[in-house]
Amino acid sequence: MSQDAPSCFTAIISPADRVQVLAEALPYIQRFAGKTIVVKYGGAAMVKENLRDLVIRDIVFLATVGIKPVVVHGGGPEINSWLERLNIPVQFVGGLRVTDKITMEVVEMVLAGKVNKSIVQMINQAGGSAVGLCGRDGSIIEARPHQSAQLQPDIGFVGDIQSVNPKLIQSLLKEGHIPVLSSVASDENGQAYNINADTAAGELAAALDAEKLILLTDTPGILLDKDHPRSLIRKLDIYQARKLIAEGVVDGGMIPKVQCCVRALAQGVRAAHIVDGRQMHALLLEVLTDQGIGSMLVASELV
């Protein structure tokens, strides 16, 4: 293998091992060729340079072998950094960013500008053809003000998703591009809203009739015991996922991620994955190997 070989093989020592990896990946490449996979990109995999490079190369690898990746990203740490630079208070209520007018301007500047274009450039430098977008472009995502079942203070321009129009994304995929979407959207009057990136990824996956939704996180996946990584649940269905939430096994920040997966599955996405983005080549390991590395959710265990 030449020095220009994809980095996904650099950690593998022997030629025999390399051949084994390719042999194991082949049926998955054949199975998912032409299929759409929506990747929510965030967490440590977005912040740490070594992991960031590997995720980008994984995305380009998937596109190169005929799979159609779509990237949806957040950028919380970068937003916080810029708010602090501008002496704007960083506030959260119930896990949601308090987003007043000036904060919304910073959120849009950072997500749709700096973070989005950085990801696009990295993909292009790695050999892909990425196009940067936000939910406002082509009216991909229409937002509405966030509604909470609990009484809470006004949190400003935090939005829920009213509807998704996938036509622009579909056109880009048809032309061989990798769409990269930031989670900023507008309501019917053109007001910008900050949308949860997990939610945006899940709803977009459903609208695209995607084969897979993959959430890159900073946890191994869904754990029976959150203090023991070896208690990873590798496969579960919608009923089991809801049961784990009701029993309190799934709690805290994992609840909205699991709910996002469940909603995507209920709308026709074939599988949803919660994957540890801190693992090297997490995407390739989850999509192209027999065992995977995270938790896979399906509509029914019969699938």
From Swiss-Prot:
EC number: 2.7.2.8
Superkingdom assignment: Bacteria
Pathway: Amino-acid biosynthesis; L-arginine biosynthesis; N(2)-acetyl-L-ornithine from L-glutamate: step 2/4
Gene3D superfamilies per the UniProt record, alphabetical: Acetylglutamate kinase-like
Keyword Kinase in annotation: yes
Enzyme class: transferase
GO CC annotations on file: cytoplasm
Residues reported in the UniProt entry to bind substrate: 75-76, 97, 194
Swiss-Prot/TrEMBL site (Transition state stabilizer) positions: 40, 257
An MF annotation (GO) of this entry: ATP binding
Cellular compartments annotated: Cytoplasm
InterPro entries in the record: AceGlu_kinase-like_sf, AcgluKinase_fam, ArgB, Asp/Glu/Uridylate_kinase, Glu/AcGlu_kinase, NAGK-C
Function of the molecule: Catalyzes the ATP-dependent phosphorylation of N-acetyl-L-glutamate.
PANTHER family cross-referenced by the UniProt entry: N-ACETYLGLUTAMATE SYNTHASE, N-ACETYLGLUTAMATE SYNTHASE, MITOCHONDRIAL
Family, per entry: Belongs to the acetylglutamate kinase family. ArgB subfamily.
Identification of the protein by name: Acetylglutamate kinase
